[in-house]
């Protein structure tokens, strides 16, 4: 988490690019982006540079609804785009859709830390994204030499298909099936 510089709680694209540049300089191997917004040239460039540097990027698909335009950074091709499903593997009704969706993960009524009091349930693609980030981190811990493309391929190939057979605009390749942390 990064401190905010203004009273406004939202970050602009410049602040996001600056934060991602900082993370790249720290040589992180994976970044969770539980946020979504419009396309931005500077952000697209930073995402490309991080991918080329071997950094895995996982982002929330967005909560604009089925008819919403693709949200970024999830819609950039170098990013693993995550949608949210409930306990019955039904897509979150406000989740964005599109060809760029890669995986589905739990994101409805997720018990999470709250800024005011301890913890509470929250819903959205931002709450599904950390599940995929954690699964990617497990893969990378086991096999440190994996490239971002290889991490993506492993996660997508192990997903449990939901919805229409194969990749679709609602669930992507399907429900995340994380690697066993004990094997």
Feature roles, as predicted:
Residues 1-38, 159-165:
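Subtilisin-like peptidase catalytic core
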Residues 2-5, 93, 107-175:
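Hydrolase catalytic cores
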Residues 9-16, 32-102, 109-133:
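Substrate-binding/specificity loop regions of serine endopeptidase catalytic domains
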Residues 16, 22, 30, 171-183:
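C-terminal domain-closing interface element
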Residues 18, 84, 137, 153-157, ...:
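Generic alpha-helical structural context detector
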Residues 21-26, 87, 138-145:
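Flexible, small-residue-rich helix->loop connector segments that border functional cores
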Residues 61, 77, 114, 155, ...:
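Hydrophobic aliphatic residues
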